[in-house]
Amino acid sequence: MKNLFKLALCGLAFVLAACGQGIDGPDQPQTGITYKSCADKIEITGEAQEVTITITADAAWTAQVSNSKLATLVEGESGEAGTYDIVLAFSENSSLYSRNVTLYAKVEGIAQKVTICKITQKSVSEKGTDANVNKNFTWPILEHYYLWNKELKEKGNPKWDQAYDDFLDSALQSIYPKNSMDGYMYTSSTGQQQWVFYSYIERTTPTTQSVTRAEKAMYQGFGASIYAITFDDNAKYIHLAVEFVYPDSPAAKAGLKRGHYIGKINGTTITDENYYKLALENFIYEVPVGTTCTLEVSEFDWNTLDLSTQTETISMTSATYFENPVLFHNVYTYTSTKDESHKTSIGYMIYNSFDAAFDDEITKVFDVFAEEQAEVGSLDYVILDLRYNGGGNVASCRYLSSLLAGADALDGAQPKVFMYSRYNDDRMAAGGYNKNDYTTYKHDDFDKDAAMAYNFPFKEIYVIGTSDTASSSEMLINALRGIGKKVTLVGGRTNGKNVGMEVMNTQNSGAIDGNHYIFAPITFQSYNCKGESDYDDGFVPDAGFDLEASYEGFPLTDWGTDFVSAMRDGQEVYYMPDFFSHALNAILEKEFPVTTSSVKRMSPRNNASLPKQMRRLDMPKVAREGDIFRKNAWVLAE
């Protein structure tokens, strides 16, 4: 027998805010929805049931759900202006995990669809509260390890009778903003803001536990990262832009690449009504092995500054694959046409996450750099692309930083300090932690090739960063600047995560009420060898390189494209299509001034403008089972 909820009734304990509320207000973007009977977020139990939500719309409207496999619309799919009930049917959630469904409404005359509410359906195995795990696992760890444990203990009165993830969230919120370094403000494309904590807890399976160690995690699906983009002010012209594909993934083998724009999936045209659902089912959620997907893709046409009318069909079949974080690498060598002895070589690597299981892939890239250095005589610059890198394992960060630092990481025969760590006062006192407790750069004690063996005499290190660049990525910038390396930041302001996590789990202590957990609280703040850690608002791009607000952040070409030429009004014009182009051009201007060389390059003043109507749309942020790095974690994992 299904349980029937009527969310128009106020006073229910699981509703997170006042029941009846309007969406549009004097200071809010207009949505066309003036009333809804639910909070922004609600929770329901795992049993099969129906949920009814009442809305009032100003004009004709249609309802959508983010995943029709989890919930279906059985009443109120559309209507005219007025007040209506929307009924969603949920099947029983017999999995180990909670699952999320978002209800949307698209109102006639309003460009963007509006989020009515996000519904979390607990697993039937969850009894409504997790008092045991809250009392005996989460809270003791917070009391001992959390960086703001003193403030948490002073606040006291934890609410044990909650779901395990809600317990953590309410505990952290209880001392906000004292712990404001534990999180960031997320702003959607419609201007809605939400605070997101870095600290997190997950209910896991034994498979998930292995991700905290240096073992390669295997995934199933196509292996492509996408987001929605519109070239039209009314947001009706929707494509899924391919940001990147993992090497050797099914998508890569099928020919899908960065710079492709997906217009159809299995014959269905992508629109503002279905892009969210199609993205979830084909690229965000794991796809069963053997599933075939046919895409119609196009590329950006630099002559028309619009998507090309020519399309290509790509068919790919889901399989298992590894997420190698080294997405692309290359070496670019330029020779002056006026003096052939004048050469400069530039190494380029796109690194997506600090994953210790793939440190050997970093070594392979630097082997390629070393080969180029031996052939040309030098490798003068390196461009490290961290635009999508939200962090990861500190040991991997330490290794890559050592490779980049070379001999500058040494003080005589001894390695310099890579990082100082500050823990909470209780741990500092009890454990004798002080500023003399530090981590050095890797030297010849590294269990692979000695990090200093390459010793590239880089004149300058360019780092490409964005607001997604966080944690260990920022640690690398801070550490290298701390020993005097010239690091130039290109792109946008970074995330600002100068704190890190230690990952705890129940694998050794045993299951709690039949479940295992991974808990990653913020436990330390990081400083470079100069004692600097003042980047909680992010690192600001260097002068002339603040580009994130421009269109170079869109995937308009494949990786490593230097410049693009096109015909405009009968004349040849040049474009710098990416952050990489700007970094490369800056290097060439230094090495080959116009008066001394005719090396092909361009000046920013000649860079033609890109179309103003290009706009990125919000996409779902879904954590997969086992993906512990999803919230920009620094992981002190063995």
Model-assigned labels for residue ranges:
Residues 125-383, 390, 396, 406, ...:
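Flexible, low-complexity junctional segments that flank or bridge functional domains
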Residues 3, 7-11, 15-41, 108-132:
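Bacterial Sec-dependent N-terminal signal peptides
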Residues 91-98, 287-289:
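Surface-exposed, short loops/turns at beta-strand junctions within beta-sandwich domains
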Residues 42-47:
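Short, solvent-exposed loop/linker segments at the N-terminal edge
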Residues 86-88, 97-109:
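A short beta-strand micro-motif common to beta-rich folds, especially ectodomain repeats
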Residues 342, 346-349, 353-364, 372, ...:
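C-terminal "post-core" interaction segments
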Residues 49-53:
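Structural beta-strand segments of beta-rich domains
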Residues 32, 38-41, 58-87:
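Surface-exposed binding patches on compact interaction domains or structured appendages
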